[in-house]
A protein has these predicted regions:
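Short secondary-structure boundary motifs at beta->alpha junctions and helix caps
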Residues: 85-96, 163-201, 208
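Bacterial N-terminal signal peptides that target proteins for export
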Residues: 3-21
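Sec-exported extracytoplasmic/periplasmic mature domains
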Residues: 110, 114-118, 200-208
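Generic short beta-strand segments
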Residues: 66, 134-139, 171-173
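A structural "domain/chain start" motif
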Residues: 33-101, 206-212
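C-terminal motif of bacterial Sec signal peptides marking the signal peptidase cleavage site
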Residues: 27-31
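Surface-exposed short loop/turn segments
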Residues: 33-52, 111, 115-161, 178
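Envelope-exposed proteins and targeting segments
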Residues: 57-62, 75-77, 127-131, 148-154, ...
Length: 212
């Protein structure tokens, strides 16, 4: 009888601890689920833009939307396992860009070039020299299972009154700090900034007249 009473007393004493443990377990599970959900729906952009050196002020320039092939004309995050199959592109299942890379680069480029003069869009009716960018590569390239880099390649064409004033292909590379989408996003942001800086410097060296 005495043992039965002691067992009931012990059970009552342990109930609060058991309830607290259960609540803690549920909280941890909810936290893990929330974290996993966040990680499984990651959205990346290029981050804040850094300063771009320009060669003084220049005339107005019309900057068209960056053009891209179908594979890069979406918010999918593209990567390539160069060490295993360099000809095959793949996409992350749970990581995407906030907008197609071409749109992100368009914003970045217009922002950088605006520091040297007025930047017009393609829909503007003003006659002005026109810069067209054709994006051909924007991906995280894995050189090994634990090593990757961001790769961005684009061709810039500057025209005025139907005449080509200059054309050049630009290539930018930046190492990834981690072999995953987060590391790839940081690397591609750095490579994008490098590419934009190269294009801005090239535009600054071209000889073209302003609007009449």
């Amino acid at each position: 009888m005495q043992e039965h009473v002691m067992s009931r007393t012990l059970a009552r004493a342990l109930r609060p601890a058991a309830a607290a443990l259960a609540a803690l377990t549920l909280a941890l599970a909810a936290g893990c689920a929330s974290e996993n959900a966040a990680l499984s729906n990651a959205r990346y952009d290029l981050g804040p833009a850094g300063p771009v050196a320009t060669a003084g002020r220049g005339p107005a320039l019309k900057v068209l939307d960056v053009a891209a092939p179908e594979a890069l004309d979406s918010d999918k995050f593209v990567y390539r396992l160069a060490y295993a199959d360099a000809q095959r592109m793949a996409v992350y299942r749970d990581s995407r860009w906030t907008a197609p890379p071409a749109q992100l680069l368009t914003q970045r480029l217009r922002g950088a070039l605006s520091s040297r003069g007025a930047v017009l869009e393609g829909a503007d009716g003003v006659r002005a020299p026109t810069l067209r960018i054709d994006l051909s590569e924007f991906e995280q390239v894995f050189d090994g299972e634990s090593q990757s880099h961001g790769a961005v390649t684009a061709r810039a064409t500057l025209t005025q009154d139907g005449k080509v004033l200059g054309q050049r292909t630009f290539v930018a590379r930046a190492p990834s700090s981690t072999p995953d989408a987060a590391g790839g996003a940081r690397a591609l942001a750095m490579a994008s900034d490098d590419l934009v800086a190269q294009i801005a410097a090239w535009v600054g060296m071209q000889a073209y007249a302003g609007t009449p």
